[in-house]
Amino acid sequence: MEGLIEAIKSNDLVAARKLFAEAMAARTIDLIKEEKIAIARNFLIEGEEPEDEDEDEDDEDSDDKDDKKDEDSDEDEDDE
């Protein structure tokens, strides 16, 4: 890192670019590895079934709507 700073101070842009690329290469490789791991975690393991948490919530909501419709229709019958 000190070499990069010295190259910048001395206006040696070619050396600064090379030193910067070397410093960033290691960090870039680490970030790529981390991203590959994160992506791999998103894929299902063979034979594993996805969780249906969202579908269960939707089913409960639709049941509530059906119950509400039934109550509304009962109230309409009482009015007659």
Curated annotation (Swiss-Prot):
This is Prehead core component PIP. Residues 46-64 have a biased composition (Acidic residues). Keywords: Viral release from host cell. The production of one phage particle requires 250 copies of PIP. During head maturation, PIP is cleaved to form the stable head constituent, internal peptide II. The keyword Plastid does not apply. It comes from Enterobacteria phage T4 (Bacteriophage T4). InterPro entries: GP67 (IPR035114). Residues 43-80 are annotated as: Disordered. Pfam families: GP67. The record marks E46, G47 as: Cleavage. The keyword Phosphoprotein does not apply.
